[in-house]
Amino acid sequence: MAIERYFIREAVKEMLIDEFLEKELRRAGYGGLDIKKTPLGTKVIIFAANPGYVIGRGGRRIRELTRILERQFGLENPQIDVQEIKNPYLNAKVQAVRIAQALERGIHFRRAAYAAMRAIMSNGARGVEIRISGKLTGERAKSVRFYQGYLAKVGNPAETLVSKGYAQALLKLGVIGVKVAIMPPDARLPDEIEIIEKPVEEEVSSNEAE
């Protein structure tokens, strides 16, 4: 049980760090992180479309992030490594954040979703799924799903081949959740795929949106 509690605690900590970095590094095109324990401490890999923003002038921002990770989140001797995202359109986290930003600027959720889907597919993705959930058009919360192309839905391919990202938009009506899943161009799929040749939109139940 002690081992289980440790892994749960570490998973929660990584989730909280991810949420913090998403807010702090939105302008950098934040695309997620990877935390690894090393003999010298903790290696934190930050993926970003604009690494220069993460580093900051003279390394000021990355030093401040290092202090926060150590003092606020309790990471032991954190060493930050910033890696550039070569194609942000194939990173689900980046796209989820961009859709959330579009919603916060007042862009209609359908327009934001279809624009993102076109950009993702035109950059070579084999498939994409976007779910936008919350009070989208009125008082009743709902979830709308947009999808196109090939996407692994179950099993190991869905876990290892699909890029997944989540972000939130803070609107007057409340919080809007944005989930994005992208199948990259080089993914090699078994039979567990869903094939959608044209863009599709559908409203799903609140239970399915969870």
UniProtKB/Swiss-Prot annotation:
One GO CC term, this protein: cytosolic small ribosomal subunit
Function, in words: Binds the lower part of the 30S subunit head.
Record's keyword annotation contains Repressor: no
GO molecular function list: rRNA binding; structural constituent of ribosome
Name of the featured protein: Small ribosomal subunit protein uS3
Keyword S-adenosyl-L-methionine: no
Binding partners and assembly: Part of the 30S ribosomal subunit.
UniProt keyword terms in alphabetical order: Ribonucleoprotein, Ribosomal protein, RNA-binding, rRNA-binding
Family: Belongs to the universal ribosomal protein uS3 family.
InterPro entries, alphabetized: KH_dom, KH_dom-like_a/b, KH_dom_type_2, KH_sf_prok-type, Ribosomal_S3_C_sf, Ribosomal_uS3_arc, Ribosomal_uS3_C, Ribosomal_uS3_euk/arc
KH type-2 domain segment(s): 17-86
Superkingdom of source: Archaea
UniProt-listed GO biological process terms: translation
Entry-linked CDD domains: KH-II_30S_S3_arch
Gene3D superfamilies reported in the protein's UniProt record: 3.30.300.20, Ribosomal protein S3, C-terminal domain (3.30.1140.32)
